[in-house]
Amino acid sequence: MNAMTAFSLNGAAPLANADELEAALRQIGTARYHNLHPFHRLLHGGKLNKGQVQAWALNRYYYQSSIPIKDAVVISRFRDRATRVEWRHRIEDHDGDLGSEGGIERWLKLTEGLGLDSGYVESTQGILPATRFAVDAYVHFVRDRTPLEAIASSLTELFAPNLHEERIAGMLAHYDFVNPEIMSYFKRRLEQAPRDTDFALRYVKQHATTPAEREAVCNALIFKTNVLWAQLDALHHAYVDGHIPPGAFVPQGF
């Protein structure tokens, strides 16, 4: 496996085939997925107070609500109808459809259950500047880079089910203000994420046909892990270390 810098693969050995590409992607997840971040360790281990959990859910809403926007941009990159049809359900997963609840509504159940006003959450007025910068950078990435890289950047979902299971179990066990109903977003993603990643992984393995394209796929995944990690860095700095920037959400009693 090539060495990694903070932003890219950095080594001389090219990835020779699709199997080597998949192995490299999985190693990136093992080394860099945000389940390893100290903030998640605190969150899942019951070490945060309610205000800190509120801050996490509030900021994460901006990411969740931007996912269907990102996916609409991905769809716009493809002339191939079959790819657009396959990707379209991701928008419905988060936005919902007529008569069906989507992931954004489930996330608002979480924030409401934690005592946050939904209007305030949806306004995104209280989120950290770094949250906005990181999420917007992700939307811009899928707009500006190749369609192959746009799809590759979604592959953090390969590693999400284990994180969701850890989150459900840990938060239900440790926080008396959390119940199964408000954790419904994560339960639903346990079913949705594997379906999404099956297609995305097949796509990049099939369409990344040169060493340069395989490296670009890996670097797209590294970029996405940085997007996720940077959001948690900002949360930790603001709500664990106590350096809340002006204008951001301040929990009661903080």
From Swiss-Prot:
<comment type="similarity">
    <text>Belongs to the PqqC family.</text>
</comment>
<dbReference type="InterPro" id="IPR011845">
    <property type="entry name" value="PqqC"/>
</dbReference>
<dbReference type="InterPro" id="IPR039068">
    <property type="entry name" value="PqqC-like"/>
</dbReference>
<comment type="pathway">
    <text>Cofactor biosynthesis; pyrroloquinoline quinone biosynthesis.</text>
</comment>
<protein>
    <recommendedName>
        <fullName>Pyrroloquinoline-quinone synthase</fullName>
        <ecNumber>1.3.3.11</ecNumber>
    </recommendedName>
</protein>
<dbReference type="InterPro" id="IPR004305">
    <property type="entry name" value="Thiaminase-2/PQQC"/>
</dbReference>
<dbReference type="GO" id="GO:0006790">
    <property type="term" value="P:sulfur compound metabolic process"/>
</dbReference>
<keyword id="KW-0560">Oxidoreductase</keyword>
<dbReference type="GO" id="GO:0033732">
    <property type="term" value="F:pyrroloquinoline-quinone synthase activity"/>
</dbReference>
<dbReference type="InterPro" id="IPR016084">
    <property type="entry name" value="Haem_Oase-like_multi-hlx"/>
</dbReference>
<keyword id="KW-0884">PQQ biosynthesis</keyword>
<dbReference type="Pfam" id="PF03070">
    <property type="entry name" value="TENA_THI-4"/>
</dbReference>
<comment type="function">
    <text>Ring cyclization and eight-electron oxidation of 3a-(2-amino-2-carboxyethyl)-4,5-dioxo-4,5,6,7,8,9-hexahydroquinoline-7,9-dicarboxylic-acid to PQQ.</text>
</comment>
<dbReference type="GO" id="GO:0018189">
    <property type="term" value="P:pyrroloquinoline quinone biosynthetic process"/>
</dbReference>
